[in-house]
Amino acid sequence: TKAINYEMKDELITEKVGCIIAATGYDLMDWTVYEQYGGGKYPDVITSLQYERLLNASGPTGGHIVRPSDGKEPKKIAFIQCVGSRDPSRGRNLCSGFCCMYTAKQAVLTKDHIPDSQSYVFYMDIRAVGKGYDEFTRRAVEEYGTEYIRGRVSKIYPDGNGQYVVMGADTLLGTQVQVTVDMVVLAVGIEASHGAAALAEKLRISYDHYGFFMESHPKLRPVETNTAGVFLAGVCQGTKDIPNSVAQGSAAAAKVLSLFSRDKLQNDPQIAHVDIKRCVDCGKCIKCCPFGAIKEEAFRGQLKAKVIDTVCQGCGVCTSTCPQGAIQLSHATDNEILAEVNTLCQF
């Protein structure tokens, strides 16, 4: 159909929009830092995404599983999970969320492609929490003969005969394990997309210490952000698999459509307001506002702070920053809050 234009060049486009859906996805972490796995050094130690391309009919090998080093068909394959996930020693405590399932899928497909093959999966815990997920992992073991070994891999090295020795521990049996395989597949942990932090600064939205965008409320507003009109979809908000990403994308689209169906938008009445008599134009509120909702405006020959009502989200950062107490939140002024505290202290 010639739907893809291979000659297309980068183009800068400027548009005015009413809503933005951030769906920046994720990137794989730098797996070469795990030198004990031979990442980037041994040609037959590859990532799960690279192995996925080998399994794909449109991939470089037409769906045939071969070793990158010599093009031979592997008979024994070791899958190592949690490479860069749940690893406090490297400051990576989060679980990538979907590695357990795609590893089981790849082990099943390997058996379909190479019936006389044997797959070994080194894992920490099997986190199969979705619909039908646990049943699928059981099928991988019971019907396809995948051998699961609970424990970390300590080292991978070539044995000199074209194969690789995988050394680890079986924590269930309390013994050392040594497996000789033809190929090793690493389930590499994910991280926030490169450039996500810069985008968050432009959109004026928060992000956590892993770099994933923060939702407005984890239960009640999971696709919204603290900036009105900016929504989240997919892994940019946190680790999730394809069904959850599709569901969140649909929810974000529904939120946008609900805004388009209205003639007028309603803003939260609890916004900041400025007492121009007390304002000395120090500029601290302008610098601290995460939404850019405060500007300078001339009043009787003097510059004063001015709150843009339609932009203010009522977060209250400016009220706690102002040294003169010139900015207050509507229905939550200092006097009102202190009156509530004094009343509570009477009981």
Region spans (language model):
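Residues forming the flavin
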Residues: 1-347
